[in-house]
């Protein structure tokens, strides 16, 4: 078969030119500056220019300097102004290290906004040394930081075309790099959206091959018959090897991206669902694009906008299945993404080609003026609209995700994503989407920037026929009518969780006027609690790193509120001047505990906000038990432990003693102190013995008619802090102690340990952190992982083939680790499959 490469090149060059014009059209001066200088700064290396790294490999094949770049050089490098003849040779080396530079993604599409990233593929020669690639990586890092000065985000991806074609593009997962999560689907997105900024053209775009699976053999034929020379092209390979195995990892990746870019991920995860519905005859959009481009069938109104092409494909899919509500949500998401950051007062907005095309779509969709106005006012949305939008987003994303999981089950696919990437992705998704008792749901901050309320009213309900017992918050001043109409904003069983929800979602700020209706909590107490919470926890902290996600979700900081909602000290009429510790927990002739409620708020290593509420005579016991169970042996102590007492009486004393108890229990649990010999505590007239075990505290009531001596805990609370002691070695443990450091509730975790004879041990922690041990296993660990993943995907379908008793939830995907024996002990790292990396 013969190909008209000359004609194809003209068409591709025209589209590149059009897309570059559209990328610059309506964009800021800063964006235009960075976009136009990008290739120049990769092509040359000079101390006066951004991105300079000594000995960095530079030079882009077939580079032609633009007038804008030439003027920039003349003003930035003074020596050039005197001798402009140096311009053509202004390069570090005569041999070009870079074969091509391409921008992909939303740039030049209807979804490009002032916040759009420049996702840039830098394809380098495959013979660069490791040292040269590291220098080039440093150069791109410096250019990334340079662009940030203009508020432009660039993500550089160093690409080796030969390595990519061999399915060996599996760099570590990062916030912008999908790692091993998707391969062919990534290439599909690249081909349909790529803009060549400089360098060699993409071979795949120029060859209209009828059977895509024959692409590689057809290229070999063209080379053999000397119709093409591969040195003239960049070739990442064809799209004929799309496997069903990619869908699961790709869906996880899109959910992951949906945390920070929700409306963009809506259309992308739906495209995956659409593709899976066509399997095994999936017709990728990139193939559709190439056929339309090379046969002259491109839509003249948008010249193949990749974002609109996704929308068209998704529209056909949802219409076919009569899912019109989902289609409406997708259209609203597309509109919100395309108009993100748009200033409607800008006189040039009406001349924006993106806005003009949106107007055509709105007419096709028959939208009302009220809906358009509501969407245009997204920046001003408040909590009720944001909650509705957030819940709709989660519902939509999770439905697509579950449909893709069902597809994986149906076709019994083995995920192509590597175990270490699964671990990071699922834990990230677990923190963002999994709803758990006591966990604060953080509304997506990308929906609206300002949720603050002028007034917040908290009211307590008990014994109502209309409302469930608990706490409610409304964004208004006290009004009976508001309650009757059930127009509350949020509900929680505990005040602690409700206040934390309002605070960490930026609804409650320093400028919010607080109101409360409660027989148990005064406005003064509420204000004190809010202030203590605000001063103890910043709303935002540094983003969780992938390294953090490989560790257990250790508590980083916590506050404890004593007697916030139940305060037994209000009933005390006679005040004792001297108080012993035992008196506080078993006070007066009725031996009542003066700790009526304990509320705990903590932030863990994964940046989750969790709350705990304990109420009743044994509140202190339950709080110590549950808190200790969340602290594992050898873990670092929380960076912040604050105890606040809101008691009517004995406020300071209660605070001090609860602080001492919590610190003592945590110190014992992490191994910084030894348990007291007589670890008894008398609470509400009963004697309790504490047993400090590997996974926390257990309690046992001691029944005795004899009067017990002062407890070890009481004595400890009255003495000075002891010097740090070393924990006794545990000789009863039958597994490496380092495993405890990685124990994470909610996940099934597998730890592989190699033996000297070639066999291996497997330590399994279930979702409740119970351990099972399998010793001297043989075979390949990679095959064991595939077996476990298959059981996970099939769990619930075949209960007889489930030896690990796996229960599938949304994001409890099995986690795999390797134990490495080192001189200073055992190190645990995410399992890296040698098969996947080979």
From Swiss-Prot:
GO terms for molecular function: adenylate cyclase activity; ATP binding. GO terms for biological process: cAMP biosynthetic process. Residues 547-838 are annotated as: Regulatory. It is an enzyme of class 4 (lyase). PROSITE patterns: ADENYLATE_CYCLASE_1_1, ADENYLATE_CYCLASE_1_2. Disulfide bonds: none annotated. Keywords: ATP-binding, cAMP biosynthesis, Cytoplasm, Lyase, Nucleotide-binding. It is found in: Cytoplasm. Residues 1-541 are annotated as: Catalytic. GO terms for cellular component: cytoplasm. Transmembrane segments: none annotated. It comes from the Bacteria. It catalyses: ATP = 3',5'-cyclic AMP + diphosphate. Its EC number is 4.6.1.1. Coiled coil: none annotated. InterPro entries: Adenylate_cyclase_1 (IPR000274), Adenylate_cyclase_1_CS (IPR024686), Adenylate_cyclase_1_N (IPR024685). PANTHER family: ADENYLATE CYCLASE. Belongs to the adenylyl cyclase class-1 family. This is Adenylate cyclase. It comes from Pasteurella multocida (strain Pm70).
């Amino acid at each position: 078969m013969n190909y008209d490469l000359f004609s194809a090149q003209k068409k591709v060059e025209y589209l590149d030119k059009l897309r570059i014009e559209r990328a610059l059209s309506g964009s800021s001066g800063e964006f235009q500056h960075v976009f136009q200088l990008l290739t120049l700064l990769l092509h040359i290396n000079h101390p006066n220019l951004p991105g300079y790294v000594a000995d960095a490999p530079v030079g882009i094949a077939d580079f032609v300097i633009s007038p804008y770049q030439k003027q920039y050089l003349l003003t930035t490098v003074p020596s050039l102004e005197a001798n402009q003849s140096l311009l053509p040779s202004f390069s570090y080396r005569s041999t070009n290290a870079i074969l091509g530079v391409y921008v992909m993604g939303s740039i030049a599409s209807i979804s490009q906004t002032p916040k759009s990233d420049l996702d840039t593929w830098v394809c380098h020669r495959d013979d660069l040394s490791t040292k040269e690639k590291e220098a080039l990586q440093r150069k791109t890092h410096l250019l990334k930081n340079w662009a940030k000065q203009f508020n432009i985000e660039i993500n550089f991806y160093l690409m080796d075309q030969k390595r990519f074609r061999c399915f060996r593009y599996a760099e570590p997962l990062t916030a912008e790099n999908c790692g091993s999560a998707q391969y062919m689907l990534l290439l599909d997105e690249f081909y349909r959206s790529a803009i060549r900024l400089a360098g060699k053209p993409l071979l795949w775009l120029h060859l209209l091959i009828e059977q895509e699976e024959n692409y590689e053999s057809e290229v070999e034929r063209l080379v053999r018959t000397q119709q093409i020379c591969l040195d003239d092209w960049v070739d990442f390979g064809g799209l004929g090897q799309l496997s069903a195995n990619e869908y699961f990892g790709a869906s996880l990746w899109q959910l992951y991206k949906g945390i920070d870019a929700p409306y963009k991920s809506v259309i992308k995860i739906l495209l995956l669902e659409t593709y899976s519905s066509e399997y095994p005859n999936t017709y990728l959009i990139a193939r559709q694009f190439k056929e339309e481009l090379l046969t002259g069938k491109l839509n003249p109104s948008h010249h193949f906008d990749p974002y609109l092409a996704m929308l068209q494909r998704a529209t056909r899919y949802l219409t076919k299945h009569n899912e019109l509500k989902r289609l409406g949500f997708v259209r609203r998401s597309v509109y919100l993404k395309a108009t993100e950051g748009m200033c409607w007062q800008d006189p040039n907005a009406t001349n924006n080609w993106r806005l003009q095309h949106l107007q055509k779509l709105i007419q096709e969709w028959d939208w009302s003026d009220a809906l358009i106005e509501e969407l245009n006012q997204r920046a001003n949305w408040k909590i009720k609209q944001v909650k509705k939008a957030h819940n709709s987003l989660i519902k939509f994303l999770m439905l697509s995700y579950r449909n893709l999981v069902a597809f994986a089950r149906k076709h019994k696919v083995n995920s192509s994503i590597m175990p270490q990437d699964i671990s990071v992705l699922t834990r990230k998704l677990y923190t963002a989407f999994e709803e758990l008792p006591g966990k604060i749901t953080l509304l997506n901050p990308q929906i609206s920037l300002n949720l603050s309320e002028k007034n917040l009213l908290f009211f307590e309900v008990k014994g109502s026929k209309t409302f469930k017992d608990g706490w409610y918050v409304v964004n208004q001043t006290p009004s009976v009518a508001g309650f009757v109409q059930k127009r509350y904003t949020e509900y929680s069983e505990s005040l602690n969780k409700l206040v934390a929800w309002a605070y960490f979602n930026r609804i409650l700020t320093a400028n919010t006027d607080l109101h409360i209706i409660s027989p148990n909590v005064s406005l003064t107490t509420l204000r004190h609690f809010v202030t203590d919470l605000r001063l103890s926890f910043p709303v935002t902290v540094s983003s969780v790193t992938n390294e953090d996600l490989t560790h257990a979700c250790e508590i980083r900081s916590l506050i404890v509120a004593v007697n916030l909602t139940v305060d037994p000290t209000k009933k005390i009429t006679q005040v004792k001047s001297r108080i012993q510790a035992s008196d506080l927990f078993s006070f007066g002739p009725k031996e009542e505990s003066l700790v009526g409620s304990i509320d705990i708020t903590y932030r863990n290593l994964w940046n989750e906000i969790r709350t705990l509420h304990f109420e009743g005579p044994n509140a202190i016991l339950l709080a110590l038990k549950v808190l200790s169970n969340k602290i594992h042996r050898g873990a670092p102590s929380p960076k912040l432990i604050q105890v606040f007492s809101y008691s009517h009486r004995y406020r300071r004393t209660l605070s001090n003693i609860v602080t001492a108890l919590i610190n003592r229990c945590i110190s014992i649990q992490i191994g910084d102190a030894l348990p007291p010999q007589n670890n008894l505590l008398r609470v509400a007239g009963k004697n309790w013995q504490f047993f400090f075990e590997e996974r926390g505290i257990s309690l046992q009531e001691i029944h005795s008619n004899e009067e017990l001596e002062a407890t070890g805990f009481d004595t400890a609370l009255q003495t000075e802090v002891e010097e740090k002691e070393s924990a006794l070695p545990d000789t009863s443990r039958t597994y490496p102690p380092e495993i405890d450091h990685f124990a994470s509730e909610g996940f099934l975790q597998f730890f592989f340990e190699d033996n000297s004879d070639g066999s291996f041990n497997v330590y399994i922690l279930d979702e409740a952190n119970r351990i099972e041990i399998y010793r001297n296993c043989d075979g390949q660990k990679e095959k064991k992982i595939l077996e476990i993943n298959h059981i996970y995907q099939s769990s619930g379908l075949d209960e007889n083939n489930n030896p690990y008793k796996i229960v599938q939830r949304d994001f409890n995907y099995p986690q795999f680790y390797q134990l490495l024996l080192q001189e200073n002990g055992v190190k645990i790292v995410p399992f890296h499959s040698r098969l996947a990396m080979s």
